[in-house]
Amino acid sequence: MAPNYFQKPEAALKRAEELIQVGKESDALDTLHDTIKARRHKQWTTVHEQIMIKHMELCVDLKKQHLAKDALFQYKALTQQINVKSLETVVVHFLKLAEQRTEDAQKQSIEKVEEIGDLDQGDVPERLLLAVVSGAAAQDRMDRTVLAPWLRFLWDSYRNCLELLRNNAQVEQLYHTISRHSFTFCLRYQRRTEFRKLCDLLRMHLNQIQKHQYAPNVNSFRVKLTSPESLGLMQDTRLIQLDTAIQMELWQEAYKSAEDVHGMMQLSKDKDKRTVKPASYVNYYDKLALVFWKAGNSLFHAAALLQKFIIYKDMKKSFTQDEAQEQATRVLLATLSIPEGSDSPSDLSRNLDIEDQHVANMRLLSNLLRLPIAPTKNGILKEAARIGVPEAAGQTAKDLYKLLESNFSPLKVAKDVQSVLDTVTRPDHLQYVESLQAVAAVKALKQVSVIYEAISWERIRKIIPFYSDLALERLVVEASKHRIVKAQLDHRADCVRFGSSDATLAGGVDECDNNEGFTGDDTQLGVEGVRNHLEAMYTRLRGLVEGLDAEKRRKEILKKIEGQVTSYEKNRPTEIERIHRRKKMLENYKENWERVKAEKTAAAATEQAKREEAARAEEMKRLDEQNKESERKRKQAEQDEIQKKIKQDQLYKMQQNAIYQEIIKEKGLEQFRDMDPEQVLREQRERLDKERAETQRRLQQQEKNFDHHVRALHLEELNERRAVMNMRLSEAPKLHDLYEEARIAKEIAAHDSHVKLWGMWDQVRDATFDWVESVKIDNQETLEKKLSDWQAKLEAVRNNRLAERAEDRKKKRKEDAIQAKIAEERKKREEEERARLQVIEGQRRQHNDGRGRREMENSVAMQDNDWRRNPPRESLPPRETRPMRDGPTREPREFRGDRDREPREPFREVPSSKADTDNSWRSSAQPTRKPDDRRSDEFRRNDDVRRNDDVRRNDPPRPASKADTGDKWERGVKPVVSPPKTDAPSVSEPKSEGPKRFVPPHLRNRQGGGGAGGSEEQSAPARSGNSNVTSPPDRAQGLRGPPPTGRNSLPRRDGPPPRSNNTGNTGNADSGSWRK
């Protein structure tokens, strides 16, 4: 049957009943289930409860557990805020149906087995073979066939209902009721596995309650552990769980359940001490004592009974004598039946070095009994004696207490205990008989070991009569093994020897040989007094014997001594040698044994360390891989979650968009939410394309089938509209005239109203002005006072503002002064830094100038001086090689302040000016070098010097021009003009032998005595000049000044400052104009 998501609840219920009548229960169940899951009807009504009851009945009939679980969770969300009682009704009805069907299945299984047993005919071969192969009885096979499916269904029902109702305060009572029914189910059908799972499920639910106790926005109906009702329900449920575990004899689960009960009691006690009732403690200790007895822990069994007796006594101040006697007798018998050494770790724990684990277990068990320290037998006996347990116990328990704790009669203690035990008849007391016999036998054995050094086996049998030979021998061995007594069985002499054993080849005596006392029995039973009495009697008897036979004994002793002396003298060397040999043999054996033991221990320790290291490395590797895998999975999960959230957001936006409503209607909301956004977009695009094509097709069809009748109707309608328009145009003037008449009448009426109002105002105007003047006169003083107050307030505000402004100006001047001082200090530091860098640069230049430069080769490219590619000029006459001469020395100029310290600005190319294009003044000189000329500096200097020498030698001297005498470009430094040539030969330096050495122009003044001052004087104008000014005229000779100084170590591309003209060539061009 196809699901119907939008069917009304009433119709769905009616439809389901109709389907049930025709035998289609499965279809009816699907119909009801779809109605419960439908999102349209989310308001609870009574019809929903009827639907759920019918749904649960069908689920039980068809064994559809998963549908029942899904429907119950849906119904919980529906009734959580409205009617929780309806949910409880449905759950109870569902469980009753499941329990009834399970009981019916059990009865049916028994009836089928009985039916088979009543047949007169024998078993057929098939049944016999099945019985042999399966190895089970007929009832077991029938239970597996008929009962097992319903048991599984009922167990799933309980578990699902508990999962449904967990951590919900509204249905907490029903939750605990179902839990107790579940325990009854496990006990009735002996479902041990299900009982363990149920206990684990309840523990998990409690952990979740504790985890989410204070978590915000988790569950508004969560169970609160501060509620006494909730704690009481949980405590009662855990006690029933403990009782069920004991009845099913699941002692491990009983112990865990006891821990759960203890935890609940501690939690309740922390919240409110009055929450836990004394009766609960009595029940708890009773069950816990039974668990300890089944576990074989008689020490804690007795401690639990003692705690129960104390609480029972406090709960009933005046309880009857019979009740007190019964409880005290049981406590006393349980305490006396505690064996020796029950509170100490076993031999296995000592040998395996796990005594800490034993102490931890003792502490844990003590916590379960609410004891601050671990109990001991002596402690329990003292506590019992303090509260009067021996006095309140029965006569049998009293007699046993006196025999075992207050009497020293080693030869008849066991017989007396056996005679008393024969009078015990109650079943709850008979369980202690065997333990009491073992305690009495050990007690008698200890007392005998104190008195005798050796005793025959037959006498031991008579002293301890209630054991066989084998059992008695096992008792002696166990007592000696647990170091209760020091005894050895001598089978050759058929006796038992007490005391320490002799030293053997394996080492010294046992550790227990150093212990002289035995668990405090010496002080309790008077052993020390008996020993002293026997020693005194022995001393007196010995003295009496020696007094009666003194002479005879003296002669015998002397004779015996003489014989021993003779024998000693005869065998002394042999005995001495034998003793030494035996001692040496023992020492060697002991050394070898110790060495072997040490080697084994070292080898074992090394092997253990290797195994531990390997295990540790393997564990670290596993943990590392596990962490990496977990991190990868976490990142992948985060990515998947992000992608899922993005898709959900996209689908939600699409769902809100009206464009995608057609897809939602066709696919359904659930299927639409599961779709991929890309798929939705692709499908919507296909739909739009399809609709567009359909629309285009229809339009084309309409164009073909144009309706001419409609066109004719439109033409007629146009004529009608034209007639209506003409009629309205003819009536428009009349309507306008009527509107104007109405408007004029309205204006006239308004004017008359205004005139009337003015007349009324004119009548009272003088009186109004008189009243206003009188009011002003009456309030003249008040007005003047307010004006004076306002003036005073205004003056105060004005003075305050002026004071504030003055203060602000004062602060501003102070801040400006501070900032100016800071700027001055910063500028001073910068100047000092620049000066320091200049000194460093000067030292670097001096160091570099000391080394000569390599002369450039005279190639064709180097002799090409027409770098401006101007028209070819006439070649100069050939020159002869002449040595270079240094120019005249210039006096160092004085320091001119911060202007000399300013760093040179970087070269900036400027557009060509008129002076750049004027080449008239260059008619007698070589063209100047452009900033971007990349030719060799050394070759250019050589060429300029030679050219100037030729010109000075051939041309007559010329007067200095305005460009030579102008000093604006040099900032006040007048260029040095060479004197005119005369016939007198000029003084020149003597020619040096060997190849001519080239001297850079910026070093000539230094060689001539100019020093560093000239270099500094020449570099100042270049640093302070404007970068947009054209180079000075001495650039025509291609001479360069010293390299720049400052932060930038690269050579500057603009021209150097002017230097002295030592060639006599002053030039004839008027260069003053381009320097301005």
UniProtKB/Swiss-Prot annotation:
List the Gene Ontology MF annotations in alphabetical order: mRNA binding; translation initiation factor activity; translation regulator activity
Q: What is its main location?
A: cytoplasm
The UniProt keyword set, sorted, is:
Coiled coil, Cytoplasm, Initiation factor, Protein biosynthesis, RNA-binding
The record ties this protein, via InterPro entries, to:
EIF3A, eIF3a_PCI_TPR-like, PCI_dom
Q: Which residues form the PCI domain?
A: 324-503
Q: In which compartments does the protein localize? A: Cytoplasm
Q: Which residues form a coiled coil?
A: 574-651, 678-713, 776-843
Task: Please give the residue ranges the record annotates as the region Disordered.
Answer: 600-641, 826-1076
PROSITE patterns for this protein: PCI
Q: Could you give one GO CC term from the UniProt record?
A: eukaryotic 48S preinitiation complex
Q: Which Pfam families match?
A: eIF3a_PCI_TPR-like (PF22591)
Please give the positions of the paired cysteines in each disulfide bond.
Answer: none
Q: Can you supply a Gene Ontology BP term from the record? A: embryo development ending in birth or egg hatching
Which ranges are annotated Polar residues under compositional bias?
Answer: 918-927, 1060-1076
Keyword RNA-binding belongs to the record = yes
**What SMART domains is this protein classified in?**
PINT (SM00088)
Biased composition, class Basic and acidic residues, residue ranges = 608-641, 826-857, 865-908, 929-956, 964-973
- Into which family does the record put it? Belongs to the eIF-3 subunit A family.
Tell me the function of this protein.
RNA-binding component of the eukaryotic translation initiation factor 3 (eIF-3) complex, which is involved in protein synthesis of a specialized repertoire of mRNAs and, together with other initiation factors, stimulates binding of mRNA and methionyl-tRNAi to the 40S ribosome. The eIF-3 complex specifically targets and initiates translation of a subset of mRNAs involved in cell proliferation.
Q: Which HAMAP family match?
A: eIF3a
User: How is the subunit organization of this protein annotated in UniProt?
Assistant: Component of the eukaryotic translation initiation factor 3 (eIF-3) complex.
> What is the name of this protein?
Eukaryotic translation initiation factor 3 subunit A
Encoded by which gene?
egl-45
